[in-house]
Amino acid sequence: MPKNKGKGGKNRRRGKNENEQKRELQFKEEGQEYAQVLRMLGNGRLEASCFDGEKRLCHISGRLRKKEWINNGDIILIQLRDYQNDKADVILRYNVDEARNLKTYGELPETARINETDAFDDVEDIPFEFVAEDDIDIDTL
């Protein structure tokens, strides 16, 4: 067996994906629709609820599969198929800022829930009631 003398494999040579720069907001065109991911099915497929009221099985294209991670609740842009109404292809995933901009421009309905990273900030507001052990009577329990 050869000894490992290197500093890593092909993923290290490839480097990190550092393209966090702002990109131009892409609106839907004819034959495209906005959708929200309901659940990931695996094998490059997901179930999405489109904002036209339909549920569709979507296929993640190869250029998005390893580069952009899609999670439940993400807002995506899908290309509708001409021959299958219940299936579509994922074109683009919007980040939280882009989805918020789409909502302010009126492209997404007001009822659309956008994934927030600070969803659990109000956990501190849960009241707890502490009772002293002297007040508890075992017979009444």
UniProtKB/Swiss-Prot annotation:
Q: Which family does it belong to?
A: Belongs to the eIF-1A family.
Which residues are in the S1-like domain? Answer: 21-95
* Basic and acidic residues compositional bias, start-end: 16-28
Q: Which GO terms describe its cellular component?
A: cytoplasm
Q: Which GO terms describe its molecular function?
A: RNA binding; translation initiation factor activity
Give positions of region: Disordered: 1-28
Q: Provide the function of this protein.
A: Seems to be required for maximal rate of protein biosynthesis. Enhances ribosome dissociation into subunits and stabilizes the binding of the initiator Met-tRNA(I) to 40 S ribosomal subunits.
Please give the Pfam families that the UniProt record associates with this protein: eIF-1a
Q: Write out the entry's keywords from A to Z.
A: Initiation factor, Protein biosynthesis
Q: Which GO terms describe its biological process?
A: translational initiation
Which parts of the chain are coiled coil? none
Supply the source organism's classification: Eukaryota, Amoebozoa, Evosea, Eumycetozoa, Dictyostelia
Protein name listed in UniProt: Eukaryotic translation initiation factor 1A
